[in-house]
A protein has these predicted regions:
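Glycine-centered hinge/linker elements that transmit conformational signals in sensory
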Residues: 23-25, 67-99
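Short, solvent-exposed loop/beta-turn-alpha elements that line the ligand-binding surface or hinge
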Residues: 30-31, 59-82, 138-147, 239
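Extracytoplasmic/periplasmic substrate-binding proteins
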Residues: 44-51, 85-175
């Protein structure tokens, strides 16, 4: 927030064009002794890249379903091309660093805008910087509650767990979700939330978005404006790289980290839509190979 004030920016960007404008103004504050960047995108971090890319209006990297077949979705995709051009221009104009240690730079007051998750809150609080939390922009500035942003973590009990271990894990999960050991449920009906549950307390203290409806609908969670503003709708798509049902999620995610960095650092300057088509043809082929390997 201090960088925003020094740069004369009064409003939080709600569009990607406004992000660029803010990044330019904040980057102008940089000196040789104290480098400052207006934008802090992690070009190597798959999940955060995907969150940004989806806000441009594109779908999964790989679309379709098992019945009708899957297909790669990098080419002939205007929204994807727009996202890639925007990311690269931020870097080429000197508004976004190449470094991967964006967290430390943010904590040092050297980054104006960044994407991250609730796990960073403790670091930022400890640093003492004056910061705020807002939803990612969109192309038009309209909110897109239909996309879940960032990381939605889950508890799982593996098939290799012993009966004793599985039972202990189940008891912990029930306690975490309800605070009482009651069976976890999908609605708030018949559940006493007069006391804050461990799950809700953790979300509130970390400012971490929650997908468990009883927690989201609890009065404690609803009392935190920033959580309410950022929590996706109940019908939101979970942020993923590939359409549900694919068997190569991790391969596709790894591919994305490679191609975003390759494009940003090695792609042509002043890129066009056609440049994106030419550059990503090989990565489109890589994704098609994943599909063929798993389903042919």
């Amino acid at each position: 927030k201090d960088l925003f004030e020094q740069a004369g920016i009064e409003e939080v960007p709600t569009t990607f064009d406004q992000w660029t404008e803010a990044a330019e103004k904040i980057s102008a504050l940089s000196t040789a002794e104290n480098p400052i960047y207006g934008s802090g995108l992690f070009y190597c971090y798959n999940g955060q890249n995907q969150s940004v890319i989806q806000r441009f209006g594109t779908d999964y990297m790989i679309t379709g379903n098992e019945e009708d077949g899957f297909e790669a979705n990098l080419l002939d995709n205007q929204a994807f091309a727009d996202a890639m051009i925007w990311m690269k221009n931020l870097y080429d104009n000197g508004y976004n660093p190449q470094e991967t240690d964006i967290d430390s730079m943010m904590a040092a007051g050297q980054i104006g805008l960044m994407t991250n998750g609730g796990w960073l809150k403790g670091t930022l609080d400890a640093s003492g910087i004056n910061y705020g939390i807002a939803s990612l922009p969109t192309v038009t500035g309209e909110d897109q509650k239909e996309y879940a942003l960032g990381d939605m973590s889950s508890f799982m009990i593996t098939t290799s767990a012993t009966d004793e271990t599985a039972k202990a894990a189940e008891e912990f999960i029930n306690w975490w979700m309800t605070g009482t050991g009651l069976e976890a449920c999908e609605t708030t009906q018949d559940v006493d939330y007069s006391n804050v549950t461990p799950n809700a307390e953790w979300s509130i203290s970390m400012c971490y978005l929650n997908a468990y409806l009883p927690t989201v609908n609890s009065k404690e969670y609803q009392a935190v404006d920033v959580l309410v503003d950022l929590t996706p709708s109940e019908t939101a798509q979970v942020q993923m790289f590939t359409a549900p049902g694919t068997l190569f999620y991790s391969d596709a995610a790894s591919c994305q980290g490679d191609y975003v960095q390759d494009w940003v650092f090695n792609g042509p300057t002043d890129p066009t839509y056609d440049d994106v088509q030419d550059f990503f043809a090989d990565y489109q082929a890589d994704l098609e190979d994943y599909i063929a390997d798993y389903y042919d």
